[in-house]
Amino acid sequence: MGLENATKLMNYISKSGKEYICLLQMHCNVDQKELKEIISQFVGEIYQKPPVRSSVKRRIRKRRIYAIDILDMQDKLILLRVQSDAGTYMRKLCHDVGVIAGCGSHMRELRRIRSGIFTEKTNMVTLQEVSESLYLYRNCKDESELRRILLPMEYGVCGIPKVIVSDTAVNAITYGAKLNLPGILAYQNFRKNQDVAVLTLKGELVAIGESIVESKQLESGKKGEVIRPKRIFMERDIYPKSWK
């Protein structure tokens, strides 16, 4: 959930890797050794066609599953932990496991425990917690819970390569100007055409842009355009203009 300018970050966060706890219902008895062999076939690059009931076009999509762990087994119920790319359909994965097993299967329950850097154990909260913290603030003037669950939007770019820019470069970027090499003070490695977060010396998020060159080319010291802004987060004219 994003508020105000932070809503612009949601698209980037939604594309990050996911981790799920999934309850799989087999339609026949399968021993653990056989199930492990079946599941191992789905680790790596897979091809999926979205289920009939989905919000996207039903075309073949390539996704990557990084790991599938069996947490528990009771009769025909299998508890799984799955780490995957964004956009991987767990419902379809459960169905396909049953197809390979030769008896069918379906997903009974699903819980997302990680989205990018946001995890259930650290900084993910339920809508109920949001509602309760807002109630405390409005009715008891207690903002402690709101402060606990509200994170600065800079937190949302932890998984994106970053560049630190000089104060004189900030305002031009907020007007949509491309970032040139002289304005960069520090950077993390990035590839060409990769999303890069642009931050001030104070760590404030200015923009997210697409790299025009790879970071290795910056070592040459040659002047030129480095980042093309895609999403601007900072308001204009907070930092002084470097032009007249």
Please annotate each region the language model reported.
Residues 55-60, 77, 100-244:
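Accessory RNA 3′-end/elbow-binding domains used by RNA modification enzymes
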Residues 3-129, 149:
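Non-catalytic RNA-recognition surface used by pseudouridine synthases
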Residues 2-7, 192-196:
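N-terminal, positively charged regions that mediate nucleic acid binding
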